[in-house]
Amino acid sequence: MNKSTSSLDYIEKLPLPAEQAEVLREKLPQAAWNDQAVLHQALSEGSQPEGNQVNVQAEDDVALHSVQARLEMAWADGLDNGKQLGTDREGRAALKAMPVITRASMFPDVWRTNPLIRWWESLLGRTVPPRPHYSPEEKISENRWRLVGTIRRYILLALTLFQTAIATWYMKTILPYQGWALIDPFEMAGQPWTRSLMQLLPYVLQSGILVLFAVLFCWVSAGFWTALMGFLQLLIGRDKYSISSTTVGDEALNPEHRTALIMPICNEDVERVFAGLRATYESVEATGNLEHFDIYVLSDSNDPDICVAEQKAWMELCRDVGGAGRIFYRRRRRRVKRKSGNIDDFCRRWGNQYSYMVILDADSVMSGECLTSLVRLMEANPNAGIIQSSPKASGMDTLYARCQQFATRVYGPLFTAGLHFWQLGESHYWGHNAIIRVKPFIEHCALAPLPGEGSFAGAILSHDFVEAALMRRAGWGVWIAYDLPGSYEELPPNLLDELKRDRRWCHGNLMNFRLFLVKGMHPVHRAVFLTGVMSYLSAPLWFMFLVLSTALQVVHTLMEPQYFLQPRQLFPVWPQWRPELAIALFSTTLVLLFLPKLLSVILVWAKGAKEYGGAFRVFLSLLLEMLFSVLLAPVRMLFHTVFVVSAFLGWSVQWNSPQRDDDATPWSEAFVRHGSQLILGLVWAIGMAWLDLRFLWWLSPIVFSLILSPVVSVYSSRAALGLGCKRAKLLLIPEEFNPPRELVATDEYCRLNHQRRLDDGFMQAVFDPSVNALASAMATARHRFSRAIEDVREQNVREALNRKPEEVSNNQRLALLSDPVTISRMHYHVWQKPEAYAAWVEFYQKLPAPHIKS
């Protein structure tokens, strides 16, 4: 970039055919080759409507004149013949990235978690019953399935408690110290307290073991019966109460009921996000029902480079599919309440323009048939508030992700169908790949912060379970369409990335349990809060169970036994050990844990195993996944234990988006994260080997998994091993054997997007004419003239340019990007006076040119 020919260099950066570029050069007198004002005036000729000139407040605002012209040069096909371009009140060019706002009121109710206050208010008649929103016929239908659901859940409770009672009794009989025969209270009264403590210690340990065993076995038992009923449901193939059976599947969509597909994102993989979005859009278009849908990308990204890359990817998507006026993009400047706040903001501004909304995750892909089916189900069931699809995991290559994909694809349908069997219309909502009725969501599902102070107060982290509970509290059904195909998601590529996500989920579920006693919550959703807590609390309970079992073994081995407790006692009192009952209980527990997996494979065999690699390979995959789960279970146990403890201690939880792409774990990070587990495993194993080698064999699956945790974490994160399994047709899933067109298209568009990806987006927005025009037209801080605002703008631009680019903070960059005036002034200065800002020019010249296709 040369000062004397800066305008000519600028023209070379414009995406113009050679002939048009030459015409533009000829327009400029040689004396004006270094005058950016003349260049931008020449560019803007004919692009600004008469009487609609930019209100220029300073000499360096001249780049604002040519924003529209530069946009039309770069993305003319994405502007819908100029219909997507407009101007703000100061005449500056602005892209219509979002529709006109039609505000709706959405405010939360204060949480009332004190049961005594609730009881007092009920005595005063202050309880508000759910508003009736359905006809008498619909009420009869709902009462029918609610009665069936209640009966089923009582059966589940009875089966679980009965099974747990028997197992706990067995556990009691196999523990060595039966009854209190070895304790003589009168003797203990006259002996030192330390001796009494040693006599009581085995019984205290046994009691703790028994309580923990009962809780953990009850948790395992509930999962077993859920999977078993799901197996029977899928094997029979008919479900009288399946919500999917309420439509034929070819009904015309009601034109009065429009649907918004909304995708909240935050610092995600831009190329993958917009590839999946394009595949979903084209699939909807192929159904012939595109006019019923709009798409919203709702960004909470705070990385300036990613923000600019999102804007460019959105514009390219609109151009590629002709989606102008149907695909919208918004980036929030005030990130309030994370994802739930982002959705709430959409509902307040544009929600009342739609009857339904479908929530998508950044890695979600949905077929047009699935989306139109969800809309038909909503129209056929006017008392349904949320219908959750069952997303299938796919698209990953690492060994870890492929094991998880296989597990969720093979075992997941059993548990999802089982959940539906027990819950019916009072079910789960997982926060994505689900359709929501917008009006009741606005009226009932705004989330107030939890009252109080500490780590369990403030904004709700895991909003999905709470929103489902509030929807049901208002009288609307929450269903799982477990048998609806065409819904897909991706999983974290390695163990450490999954655990980052689990830490946030753990904290969120523990927070949600504060709502267990909130007024009006349905018992099923109180149980959902409880199961959410147990998903993570079971880890420290299991760890405590192992610690107490180890301590009991230490006491039993090292403490000198007393067989004669009284003078002249004829027969000794022996501690009891019944190995046959121990083996029976151990075998029963293994059956509860692994039978659902075997039933899943039996179901695959019954339905056809070809898409899983064949009957033999699917069985080998089962064994491989079981080995993998055995190795990882103790590792997750310790991590989840730390998460639970840290949540109670108030340690902060960062809002980090999970990694969405294949990513190998380096050895250094593995030893940092798993080093303490390796040491614990070694100490535990050596101690048990010295104490009693027989007990080490029982403990070996735990301790050796901990010792091997760094190795397993690293090698399972390798894509080479995962792809090797894929070539051997191991851990194969139907989406790989016969890929749906949506997933094929997603991979294709992902490769295309990577070819034209935008790196260092902020620097490109400062220098590149096309990217700068886009950033300026999409900036949202469009203030009227004010001297105070002008002073702030001048200060922001001056401070940024007087530093090196790498010294400008993210917050400063975001402030510059958010104002069309400041980003245009930056653009003008670096081109008008390149010698004054050599550090910026030098940085920019090292960057690859952005891919701009006119």
UniProtKB/Swiss-Prot annotation:
Enumerate the CDD domains for this protein.
Glucan_BSP_MdoH (cd04191)
One GO molecular-function annotation for this sequence? hexosyltransferase activity
Instruction: Give the EC number(s) under which this enzyme is classified.
Output: 2.4.1.-
Which sequence ranges are marked TM in the entry?
A: 155-175, 209-229, 528-548, 583-603, 619-639, 671-691, 695-715
Tell where it localizes: Cell inner membrane
Q: Kindly state which keywords UniProt assigns to this record, in alphabetical order.
A: Cell inner membrane, Cell membrane, Glycosyltransferase, Membrane, Transferase, Transmembrane, Transmembrane helix
Gene3D superfamilies reported for this sequence: Spore Coat Polysaccharide Biosynthesis Protein SpsA, Chain A (3.90.550.10)
InterPro entries per record: Glucans_biosynth_gluTrFase_H (IPR023725), Glyco_trans_2-like (IPR001173), Glycosyltr_2/OpgH_subfam (IPR050321), Nucleotide-diphossugar_trans (IPR029044)
The top EC class, named as a word, is: transferase
Q: In which pathway does it act?
A: Glycan metabolism; osmoregulated periplasmic glucan (OPG) biosynthesis
The membrane-topology field of this record reads: Multi-pass membrane protein
Q: Does the keyword Cytoplasm apply?
A: no
Q: What is its main location?
A: membrane
Could you confirm whether the keyword Membrane appears in this record?
yes
What are the record's GO terms for cellular component? plasma membrane
UniProt record, GO biological process: glucan biosynthetic process
For this chain, the family text in UniProt reads: Belongs to the glycosyltransferase 2 family. OpgH subfamily.
Tell me, what does this protein do in biology?
Answer: Involved in the biosynthesis of osmoregulated periplasmic glucans (OPGs).
In its UniProt entry, what is this protein called?
Glucans biosynthesis glucosyltransferase H
- Name of the encoding gene: mdoH
